[in-house]
């Protein structure tokens, strides 16, 4: 069985718990990632998604219609809106375990941890789909060779 480590993205974005939502918004505006891991002393303590940010920040923040309360939403800290104690998975876990976690736990990403608890990467449903597509494509090519 294929392990999570083989299909995860080792490239993760991370921030400290006290980073402002304004800073997080700027990060999301400049990268193609949809999740940022929140670390405290190099340990995973939370996850913040672009959807979490959209829910927490006023749609009027940064516009001509902005009011003081709208601007205040950007001064909130990550720890105020992050998902605490996120569900994670080990690097040696198999992909089927990850799929079950996505379905059963209704999460959109799984931080991937080494045995010592340090962050090894991140796994998203897109990573799963790309792995499945590669497997199906390989099987299709092998069928055509027969």
List each model region and its residues:
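A glycine-centered beta-loop-beta connector
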Residues: 28-31, 36-52, 102, 110-126
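Short, surface-exposed, polar/charged, turn-prone segments marking secondary-structure boundaries
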Residues: 35, 42-43, 64-67, 74-76, ...
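The conserved cystathionine-beta-synthase
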Residues: 15-32, 38-39, 88-106, 113, ...
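Tandem CBS (Bateman) regulatory domains
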Residues: 1-11, 49-87, 94, 99-103, ...
